[in-house]
């Protein structure tokens, strides 16, 4: 009985963080982050001050991530095109070649978005969560305004509403 109690306690201790509520970083100032883009450019998030920034963390093997990325151009990119908005889909934990291959497949299907690389998962560590899919919305003041992990069909609609609100708050 004691052994069962110890095993149950260990299970709860190890598994509970997986189900912890996301959004814990909401309100936090974004640390200095430089994203290496798939095309070789570097984007410093601090240079995006004044813009609303959406970071979408994903992996080539993650089916929920790919579902979300397939919806991204229509629900997010086209809606905010030409406004003070920046979106980067950050592939984490994978080599450039694998990411480039998957992005080429997606582009053949008409799914086009800016792609950043985080092969050593340093960016997601800086933002405090390594799970995927993950969306982080950074306000014009470079503070995290939305942080959500996991995929639901409604999630991009919710994110779009937050982005719209942040864009409308700007002078």
Short names for language-model regions:
Residues 1-4:
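Positively charged n-region of N-terminal signal peptides that target proteins for export
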Residues 51-53, 58-61, 131:
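Short pre-active-site segment immediately N-terminal to redox-active cysteine/selenocysteine motifs
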Residues 137-171:
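Thiol-/selenol-based redox modules, centered on thioredoxin-like
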């Amino acid at each position: 009985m004691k052994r069962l109690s110890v095993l149950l306690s260990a299970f709860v201790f190890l598994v509970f963080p997986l189900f912890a509520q996301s959004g814990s970083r909401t309100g936090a100032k974004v640390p200095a982050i430089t994203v290496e883009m798939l095309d070789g450019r570097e984007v410093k998030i601090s240079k995006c001050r004044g813009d609303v920034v959406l970071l979408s963390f994903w992996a080539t093997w993650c089916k929920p991530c790919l579902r979300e990325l397939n919806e991204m151009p229509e629900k997010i990119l086209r809606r905010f095109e030409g406004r003070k908005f920046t979106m980067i889909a950050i592939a984490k934990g994978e080599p450039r070649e694998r990411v480039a291959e998957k992005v080429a497949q997606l582009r053949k299907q008409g799914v086009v978005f800016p792609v950043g690389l985080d092969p050593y998962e340093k960016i997601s560590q800086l933002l405090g969560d390594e799970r995927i899919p993950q969306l982080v919305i950074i306000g014009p003041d470079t503070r995290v305004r939305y942080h959500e992990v996991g995929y639901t069909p409604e999630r991009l609609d919710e994110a779009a509403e937050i982005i719209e609100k942040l864009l409308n708050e700007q002078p």
